[in-house]
UniProtKB/Swiss-Prot annotation:
Phylloquinone binds at W692. Its EC number is 1.97.1.12. The lineage of its organism: Eukaryota, Viridiplantae, Streptophyta, Embryophyta, Tracheophyta. P700 is a chlorophyll a/chlorophyll a' dimer, A0 is one or more chlorophyll a, A1 is one or both phylloquinones and FX is a shared 4Fe-4S iron-sulfur center. It comes from Spinacia oleracea (Spinach). This is Photosystem I P700 chlorophyll a apoprotein A1. Disulfide bonds: none annotated. InterPro entries: PSI_PsaA, PSI_PsaA/B, PSI_PsaA/B_CS, PSI_PsaA/B_sf. GO terms for cellular component: chloroplast thylakoid membrane; photosystem I. One of its GO terms (molecular function) is chlorophyll binding. Belongs to the PsaA/PsaB family.
């Protein structure tokens, strides 16, 4: 930490009325580009309009103007998010059985959509229990609402209206901070101030206010609900906030007010700030007193973190100093120059943020089932499966986005003349070693992981089960994973004497939590089958990284195309006249990376879905005997490719294939339709531009004959456009197929 004289304070941070509000410009498609604004001559125009509308770099090269457009667009994004949230809460208030579910969450399923009786579609309204007919939802909103202490549909209405107000406010802010008071570039680049505000404000005060809400509103209301009190009898949030005696009846330490806090006698508060570990046996969710404690602790950490950086007062860390001090014995100039990169290239900044947020989203996916945070979430198998799948897909997309923007940074924002011997330059100079080693790792993982399966298929086909890799023949136990599980299972007694259970029941031990006769969570055994599929995960992830990293490291130049940077981020080939140079642009690497990301995530969600149905989810008898949905068949069936096809894909597709004539029939139709969308993508991916141009010209001839030819000349999609349309339908079709398959299955059997 350096103490120096105060830096001169920045006085004027905004420009007033920089861009006049013009409806004429809004009404003109492509007003941001001279070429597009002329209007369409060929059908390529509409594609270019979509490609460039949000590519602010192509509108202007002025960094301040680009920054303002991004900033304004963020408010628009927030507005849409608030609108979406409002819609969710409105559906809960207007069309749902939330109050009925609240009174009996183990026998009544969540529903917030009732289909109108048009041409027989009301068949979709299944019986979710309690006399309510509607579509069963798997978003987890009911569980979140209960955890936050919402007890009536009126409260949901109020929240929905509140979210609408915020949506309007965000729209206004987006307009105001672009047209009326637009921040100067210096404001966007003041990273210390931004860190202080984001850490202390958003994360610190945000967590503190949530912890406050949990303690004063959620905890007491959930106490009442768990005790079986009728939601209509429970005191309202404002009564709990204003009347300390009410809370003191549930949590005696409330009677003492803030005295224990100021006298440092904090253990007094242990009745509502706990450290128990494990799950609440009534709801199958984390102890809400544990999560309140967690948010309070997080708030303290971030409030401290938000006071670490030097702004107008000459005390604290400067980010530039920190980065430039980061030098190792083998890293040359180290992080020198990184500060300039991250304050002038928003693509570089975004790439880092997407990589971290994507990884975090995948971590969230895993925590949602291992440490289910909301009441009655763990026993709602459809929601558990949906939340895992959703967060895995989102994480995958965000990580591919990170590679995309890293490559755009390399092409558009990287200045090789000012970068010498810093970390980035050193990575670029030994990129051949990185990529060739990574390629070797992919080949090794691919052949060995797949080879283990093929061995098992062969032995199985030859009737030699004793020669297979399995828990009952040649064992390949995941010993490191089992060691980690065991360490965590034993941890509470050693590292956290106050805790009664480990962080997650999945680690091991003898604990099993069941709610209403359904398993919430139990220790998850790992064996040979998990060892095999884990190495498939390692393989697919490494291939995805290989493709994406190659795209970034060779975005500016390669031996094949030394001047690649001049061709831009996306180009079809370095031609004409140079064969063998197609599909080398940074954009093409993102395109190819998306397919492998899809492979990676598919294997993960298949593994999760089958493993949970086989070894975790199921019912428990009065004698304590657990019957799993697929009877523990994962360990012996998933060790062959044939087992995956027969006992997972085919066996579990029976529900979606036989859904016609039932309330799940929409999933059957989606299953069919999404397969079609997926197959449609192959038309774009497997045929070239010339084929379609020829066809189009013959169709145009026919139109001319009939004198119905359009003024805008039809053109085949460009190579890049065709691949973009192809990968979009491939992913959309694949994801929707999986969604229909999973939900029809789990709603029918879960």
């Amino acid at each position: 930490m350096i103490i120096r004289s105060p830096e001169p304070e920045v006085k004027i941070l905004v420009d007033r009325d920089p861009v006049k509000t013009s409806f004429e410009a809004w009404a003109k498609p492509g007003h941001f580009s001279r070429t597009i604004a002329k209007g369409p001559e060929t059908t390529t125009w509409i594609w270019n309009l979509h490609a460039d509308a949000h590519d602010f770099d192509s509108h202007t090269s002025d960094l301040e103007e680009i920054s303002r457009k991004i900033f304004s667009a963020h408010f628009g994004q927030l507005s849409i998010i608030f609108l979406w949230l409002s819609g969710m809460y409105f559906h809960g208030a207007r069309f749902s059985n939330y109050e009925a579910w609240l009174s009996d969450p183990t026998h009544i399923g969540p529903s917030a959509q009732v289909v109108w009786p048009i041409v027989g579609q009301e068949i979709l309204n299944g019986d979710v229990g309690g006399g309510f007919r509607g579509i069963q939802i798997t978003s987890g909103f009911f569980q979140i609402w209960r955890a936050s202490g919402i007890t009536s549909e009126l409260q949901l209405y109020c929240t929905a209206i509140g979210a609408l107000v915020f949506a309007a406010l965000m729209l206004f802010a987006g307009w105001f901070h672009y047209h009326k008071a637009a921040p100067k570039l210096a404001w966007f680049q003041d990273v210390e101030s931004m860190l202080n505000h984001h850490l202390a404000g958003l994360l610190g005060l945000g967590s503190l206010s949530w912890a406050g809400h949990q303690i004063h509103v959620s905890l007491p209301i959930n106490q009442f609900l768990n005790a079986g009190v009728d939601p209509k009898e429970i005191p309202l949030p404002h009564e709990l906030i204003l009347n300390r005696d009410l809370l003191a009846q549930l949590y005696p330490s409330f009677a003492e007010g803030a005295t224990p806090f100021f006298t440092l006698n904090w253990s007094k508060y242990a009745d509502f700030l706990t450290f128990r570990g494990g799950l609440d046996p009534v709801t199958g969710g984390l102890w809400l007193t544990d999560t309140a404690h967690h948010h309070l602790a997080i708030a303290i950490l971030f409030l401290i973190a938000g006071h670490m950086y030097r702004t107008n007062w000459g005390i604290g860390h400067g980010l530039k100093d920190i980065l430039e001090a980061h030098k190792g014995p083998f890293t040359g100039q180290g992080h020198k120059g990184l500060y300039e990169i991250l304050t002038t290239s928003w693509h570089a900044q975004l790439a880092l943020n997407l990589a971290m947020l994507g990884s975090l989203t995948i971590v969230v996916a895993h925590h949602m089932y291992a440490m289910p945070p909301y009441p009655y979430l763990a026993t709602d198998y459809g929601t558990q499966l949906s939340l895992f799948t959703h967060h895995m897909w989102i994480g995958g997309f965000l990580i591919v986005g990170a590679a995309a923007h890293a490559a755009i940074f390399m092409v558009r924002d990287y200045d090789p003349t000012t970068r010498y011997n810093d970390l980035l330059d050193r990575v670029l100079r030994h990129r051949d070693a990185i990529i060739s080693h990574l390629n070797w790792a992919c080949i090794f993982l691919g052949f060995h992981s797949f080879g283990l399966y093929i061995h098992n298929d062969t032995m199985s086909a030859l009737g030699r089960p004793q020669d297979m890799f399995s828990d009952t023949a040649i064992q390949l136990q995941p010993v490191f994973a089992q060691w980690i599980q065991n360490t965590h299972a034993l941890a509470p007694s050693a590292t956290a004497p106050g805790a009664t259970a480990s962080t997650s029941l999945t680690w091991g031990g003898s604990d099993l939590v069941a709610v209403g006769g359904k398993v919430a969570l139990l220790p998850i055994p790992l064996g040979t089958a998990d060892f095999l599929v884990h190495h498939i995960h390692a393989f697919t992830i490494h291939v995805t990284v290989l493709i994406l990293l190659k795209g970034v490291l060779f975005a500016r130049s390669s031996r094949l195309i030394p001047d690649k940077a001049n061709l831009g981020f996306r180009f079809p080939c370095d031609g004409p006249g140079r064969g063998g140079t197609c599909q080398v642009s940074a954009w093409d690497h993102v395109f190819l990376g998306l397919f492998w990301m899809y492979n990676s995530i598919s294997v993960v969600i298949f593994h999760f879905s089958w493993k949970m149905q086989s070894d975790v989810w199921g019912s428990i008898s009065d004698q304590g005997v657990v019957t799993h949905i697929t009877g523990g068949n994962f360990a012996q069936s998933s060790i062959t490719i044939n087992g995956w096809l027969r006992d997972f894909l085919w066996a579990q597709a029976s529900q979606v294939i036989q859904s016609y004539g039932s309330s799940l029939s929409a999933y059957g139709l989606f299953f069919l339709g999404a397969h079609f969308v997926w197959a449609f993508s192959l038309m774009f991916l497997f045929s070239g531009r010339g084929y379609w141009q020829e066809l189009i010209e013959s169709i145009v001839w026919a139109h001319n004959k009939l004198k119905v030819a359009p003024a805008t000349q039809p053109r085949a999609l460009s190579i890049v456009q065709g691949r973009a349309v192809g990968v979009t339908h491939y992913l959309l079709g694949g994801i929707a197929t999986t969604w229909a398959f999973f939900l029809a299955r789990i709603i029918a059997v879960g």
